[in-house]
Regions:
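An interfacial alpha-helical scaffold signature
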Residues: 1-213
């Protein structure tokens, strides 16, 4: 068993990866670890070990497995099998640094799979901080300040073209698509939408992207 700092695992890039998590069939009062398998070889081994002990294997996105750990008081650690030769353990406390990102992912994933209305998703996300490529007005404008954003061309259902503001859940995710090395700015989602008066699209390059018109 290895302990690896959560920031070294690159979990954000894998939030929509389908994994297998082992949940107890009976509600437990004593804390236990949540085991996750990401390879078939590890899954086969873990099934033999855990199913006789009353655990059930469930397929779900990694982000939802992380959400389970954060929301449920009876989990202690996350144990990931298949990423390295040894299993990796991450404490619940360390994972909590990802809580806001995981929460946003779960909202976006549910909306992308038609389990949550877009308007409800916006209500849940409007107060969150997102990152966009560009700048807003500052209190004291400096010479050379450029007020701008990186947009994406979209087509409405009636065929009308329009532009949406690209947003991201993390600064690192924004930088990944920032070829021109422009400033990356954090902003409240509702304020950003109001400031530009345009639709916003969050994580447009991922399968769970969401757009608020």
């Amino acid at each position: 068993m290895m302990k690896v700092p959560v920031e070294n695992l690159g979990l954000f890039e894998q939030l929509d990866r389908i994994v297998v998590a082992f949940f107890k069939k009976q509600q437990s009062t004593s804390p236990y670890d949540l085991n996750i398998s990401i390879t078939q070889e590890h899954l086969d081994r873990k099934k033999q070990e855990l199913e006789p002990l009353g655990y059930q294997a469930v397929q779900l996105p990694l982000g939802m497995a992380l959400d389970n750990i954060m929301q449920q008081p009876h989990y202690k650690n996350l144990i990931i099998g298949g990423l390295a030769p040894d299993e990796i353990m991450v404490s619940k406390e360390e994972l909590m640094s990802l809580k806001d990102i995981v929460d946003s992912f779960c909202i976006m994933y549910a909306a992308a799979n038609n389990r949550l209305e877009n308007s409800k998703a916006y209500e849940l996300m409007k107060d969150k901080t997102v990152y966009f490529i560009g700048k807003l007005f500052t209190d004291i404008p400096k010479a050379g300040d450029e007020i701008a954003y990186l947009g994406i061309d979209r087509i409405a259902s009636d065929g009308t073209p329009y532009e949406a503001v690209k947003c991201f859940l993390t600064e690192e995710s924004a930088e990944k698509y920032n070829g021109e090395k422009r400033p990356v700015t954090p902003a409240n989602l509702a304020y950003l939408k109001s400031f530009w008066g345009k639709p916003v699209i969050i994580e447009p390059h991922r399968n769970y992207w969401i757009e608020f018109l």
